[in-house]
């Protein structure tokens, strides 16, 4: 499977016709048909319904089409960014993040980075905390903002702060009648929605460990992939969900209460390659220090 096959398939999917797609790609139709056939053999399922006019996508083909567009778009971004760096037009800083950090330190930091380094091309990549460590080692990102501690000697990490946790409750829950901090033991027996389902360890494990430390046994535990799904299920009254306090603004059709419990917090951790002294890594760390020095209580509601 290669990028050429991706481009060929996308052309056929858009044109819904092999002849027009071949003309657009400036190739003969037989080689185009052969490459699509090889692609289908490699993925193991049909992607096109050829005996219809126009050509139709199978369900698998629609999924592959959406993913192929994303892959090709990402490749184009990589090529453009690489050319800019090679021509010394712009420098690139790739930042990995978990979604919940977008509601805390990250937006302010990005604005400051652009102010101090307007020549910098900042690329944001959403990755789970565990994935960030691998991406840093592989050079796919330069900095990561996550929530899980690690032991990789090749990656340096700093805990920016310990963020308080909150519980998202259905509006009709008896616990939603109050807004005071919720004692963690009141979560005993509740249907609990945790995220992410994978990769592990992750934020879900932090939540379960906190409950275990307080000898709290939830009822049914449902695992989902991301915080947006979890909060949607809370709104639909499928259960409750523990989230970082900064994420309380994500939905307004659920009720939030801070959690009152020993070490009921989640760290916000910034990571980068060990011994990386590049100027933009140094600038990022400097700006973070300045932000906390200027506003030591700027996350009061979260700390």
From Swiss-Prot:
CDD domains: PBP2_BenM_CatM_CatR
Keyword set includes Cell cycle: no
Family in the record: Belongs to the LysR transcriptional regulatory family.
Keyword Transcription: yes
PANTHER family registered for this protein in UniProt: LYSR FAMILY TRANSCRIPTIONAL REGULATOR, TRANSCRIPTIONAL DUAL REGULATOR HCAR-RELATED
All residue ranges annotated as the HTH lysR-type domain in the record: 1-58
UniProt protein name: Probable cat1 operon transcriptional activator
Xref: InterPro entries: LysR_subst-bd, Tscrpt_reg_HTH_LysR, WH-like_DNA-bd_sf, WH_DNA-bd_sf
One GO BP annotation of this record: catabolic process
CC per GO annotation: protein-DNA complex
Superkingdom in the source lineage: Bacteria
Keywords: Activator, Aromatic hydrocarbons catabolism, DNA-binding, Transcription, Transcription regulation
Function as written in the Swiss-Prot or TrEMBL entry: Probable positive regulator of the cat1 operon which encode enzymes responsible for the degradation of catechol to acetyl-CoA via the beta-ketoadipate pathway.
Coiled coil (UniProt feature): none
DNA-binding feature ranges: 18-37
Pfam families per UniProt: HTH_1, LysR_substrate
One Gene Ontology term of the molecular function aspect: DNA binding
């Amino acid at each position: 499977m290669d990028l050429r096959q991706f481009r060929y398939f996308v052309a056929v999917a858009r044109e819904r016709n092999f002849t027009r797609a071949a003309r657009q790609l400036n190739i003969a139709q037989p080689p185009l048909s052969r490459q699509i056939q090889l692609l289908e053999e490699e993925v193991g399922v049909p992607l096109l319904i050829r005996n219809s006019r126009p050509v139709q996508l199978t369900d698998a083909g629609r999924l592959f089409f959406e993913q192929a567009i994303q892959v090709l778009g990402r490749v184009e971004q990589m090529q453009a960014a690489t050319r800019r760096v090679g021509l010394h037009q712009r420098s690139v800083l790739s930042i990995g993040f978990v979604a919940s950090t977008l509601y805390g330190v990250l937006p302010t930091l990005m604005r400051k980075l652009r102010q101090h380094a307007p020549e910098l091309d900042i690329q944001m990549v959403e990755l789970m905390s565990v994935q960030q460590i691998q991406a840093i080692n592989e050079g796919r990102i330069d900095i990561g903002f996550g929530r899980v501690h690690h032991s990789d000697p090749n990656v340096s990490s700093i805990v920016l702060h310990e963020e308080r946790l909150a519980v998202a409750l259905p509006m009709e829950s008896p616990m939603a009648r109050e807004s005071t901090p919720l004692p963690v033991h009141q979560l005993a027996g509740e249907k609990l929605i945790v995220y992410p389902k994978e990769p592990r360890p992750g934020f879900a494990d932090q939540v379960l460990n906190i409950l275990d430390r307080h000898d709290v046994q939830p009822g049914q535990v449902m695992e989902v992939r991301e915080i947006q799904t979890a909060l949607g299920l809370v709104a639909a009254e499928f259960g409750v969900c523990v989230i970082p306090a900064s994420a309380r603004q994500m939905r307004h059709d659920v009720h939030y209460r801070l959690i009152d419990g020993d070490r009921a917090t989640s760290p916000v951790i910034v990571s980068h390659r060990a011994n990386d002294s590049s100027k933009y890594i140094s600038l990022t760390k400097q700006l973070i220090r300045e932000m906390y020095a200027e506003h030591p209580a700027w996350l009061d509601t979260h700390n």
